[in-house]
């Protein structure tokens, strides 16, 4: 006995249940136009249907059928597929005819839900594979793509404000590549050398204090805060180094030893290093009465960059001889020598995250940032920045660093390490950005240039929350004068 079409039985059951309800005569009237269309389609496909008796029954309806012409029935897998069992052909044919009667003779074409079409497979090397509905991503991102986390939505890149939140006028800020005239203390006080004077700007109160005046015969060439931020070292054009108590605005000591200007200063735990145009580096122990305890010789030209490592065991120095040297605590000769740069090396920065990781930047003829492993004495990588590298500083909160540049864009670039992808490029200075310092909370940088301005930028996130605003300066938006 031939199996009856289950779909037709459902329709008949529907019409019988409708006739037993107390409905108006108008609603029990057969839908003639729909019946006629189905009968015509049945007659045209008589040879394909094995159960014409089940399809010739009158069909009644007790509801309005909505138009679904815009629906993609391929998503519901309603399109007929070849069947091995001939008894299922009747149901498939009936479904085809019913869909054609309700939505027109052209059924929506079944498509690959991934959006891939074989006609578009031109110059593509990746093989497209069928994906089930379970793997379809509602966010427009392939869940199987490399680097996509299945634990949650993809995290948006961190946004860095493209404008400084504060600008200070800094009259007489020198446009000299070999000087270091800006430093930020652990007590949140900014020191700036302007001409023959040093000024202190308190970031919490915005109060400006004149620390010292060297007189007409001398000028400030470098400033550097001690680690605790209570004392400031000042390098002068006459080769002297002065130590000032910032809280009392009182000079506590003057040390000699250099014959020419002192353009670079770096504090260790109890050692102050000074680099000079006379090509030498003097190590000064402030606990001793002597002006210096040792002299480091090796550079063939002016020393313009000095930085102690975070563990105070290694000192990196850069000079106008295009050389980068690394010294230990007790050596008078460099233990490591690097000559890959082709211009003056002023920009030097030790990583606070990886022991022995050193970054250096070259001048106009070089334009490269290079990375070194001083533990294994290896050159790790380099990147051409396409402009003079004036300064480098690592973030202590995240594995990023910032560089400041000269000709031709005078830009500031925030980099992601180790990929060295650019997080942000900041512009605004009209002269090369020669000076850079980082706030004690590690979120803000200040940059200085020959355009006689100091600009404050929020570039690094907080170690606890990337959305937390910097504690300093966020409410002091505007432009003022530092003296």
Curated annotation (Swiss-Prot):
<keyword id="KW-0131">Cell cycle</keyword>
<feature type="repeat" description="WD 3">
    <location>
        <begin position="257"/>
        <end position="294"/>
    </location>
</feature>
<protein>
    <recommendedName>
        <fullName>Protein FIZZY-RELATED 2</fullName>
    </recommendedName>
</protein>
<dbReference type="InterPro" id="IPR036322">
    <property type="entry name" value="WD40_repeat_dom_sf"/>
</dbReference>
<dbReference type="InterPro" id="IPR015943">
    <property type="entry name" value="WD40/YVTN_repeat-like_dom_sf"/>
</dbReference>
<dbReference type="Pfam" id="PF24807">
    <property type="entry name" value="WD40_CDC20-Fz"/>
</dbReference>
<keyword id="KW-0498">Mitosis</keyword>
<dbReference type="GO" id="GO:0097027">
    <property type="term" value="F:ubiquitin-protein transferase activator activity"/>
</dbReference>
<dbReference type="GO" id="GO:0010091">
    <property type="term" value="P:trichome branching"/>
</dbReference>
<dbReference type="InterPro" id="IPR056150">
    <property type="entry name" value="WD40_CDC20-Fz"/>
</dbReference>
<keyword id="KW-0677">Repeat</keyword>
<dbReference type="GO" id="GO:0042023">
    <property type="term" value="P:DNA endoreduplication"/>
</dbReference>
<feature type="region of interest" description="Disordered">
    <location>
        <begin position="1"/>
        <end position="28"/>
    </location>
</feature>
<dbReference type="InterPro" id="IPR019775">
    <property type="entry name" value="WD40_repeat_CS"/>
</dbReference>
<dbReference type="GO" id="GO:0010997">
    <property type="term" value="F:anaphase-promoting complex binding"/>
</dbReference>
<feature type="repeat" description="WD 5">
    <location>
        <begin position="340"/>
        <end position="382"/>
    </location>
</feature>
<dbReference type="GO" id="GO:0051301">
    <property type="term" value="P:cell division"/>
</dbReference>
<dbReference type="GO" id="GO:0009825">
    <property type="term" value="P:multidimensional cell growth"/>
</dbReference>
<feature type="repeat" description="WD 2">
    <location>
        <begin position="215"/>
        <end position="254"/>
    </location>
</feature>
<feature type="repeat" description="WD 7">
    <location>
        <begin position="428"/>
        <end position="467"/>
    </location>
</feature>
<feature type="compositionally biased region" description="Polar residues">
    <location>
        <begin position="7"/>
        <end position="28"/>
    </location>
</feature>
<feature type="repeat" description="WD 1">
    <location>
        <begin position="174"/>
        <end position="211"/>
    </location>
</feature>
<comment type="subunit">
    <text>Associates with the APC/C complex. Interacts with CDC20-1, CDC20-2, CYCA1-1, CYCA1-2, CYCA3-4, CYCB1-1 and CYCB1-2. Binds to GIG1 and PYM.</text>
</comment>
<keyword id="KW-0539">Nucleus</keyword>
<dbReference type="InterPro" id="IPR033010">
    <property type="entry name" value="Cdc20/Fizzy"/>
</dbReference>
<comment type="similarity">
    <text>Belongs to the WD repeat CDC20/Fizzy family.</text>
</comment>
<comment type="pathway">
    <text>Protein modification; protein ubiquitination.</text>
</comment>
<dbReference type="InterPro" id="IPR001680">
    <property type="entry name" value="WD40_rpt"/>
</dbReference>
<feature type="repeat" description="WD 6">
    <location>
        <begin position="384"/>
        <end position="425"/>
    </location>
</feature>
<feature type="repeat" description="WD 4">
    <location>
        <begin position="298"/>
        <end position="337"/>
    </location>
</feature>
<dbReference type="GO" id="GO:0005634">
    <property type="term" value="C:nucleus"/>
</dbReference>
<dbReference type="GO" id="GO:0016567">
    <property type="term" value="P:protein ubiquitination"/>
</dbReference>
<keyword id="KW-0132">Cell division</keyword>
<keyword id="KW-0833">Ubl conjugation pathway</keyword>
<keyword id="KW-0853">WD repeat</keyword>
<comment type="function">
    <text>Activator protein that regulates the ubiquitin ligase activity and substrate specificity of the anaphase promoting complex/cyclosome (APC/C). Necessary and sufficient for endoreduplication and correct cell expansion. Controls meristem size by stimulating endoreduplication in the elongation zone.</text>
</comment>
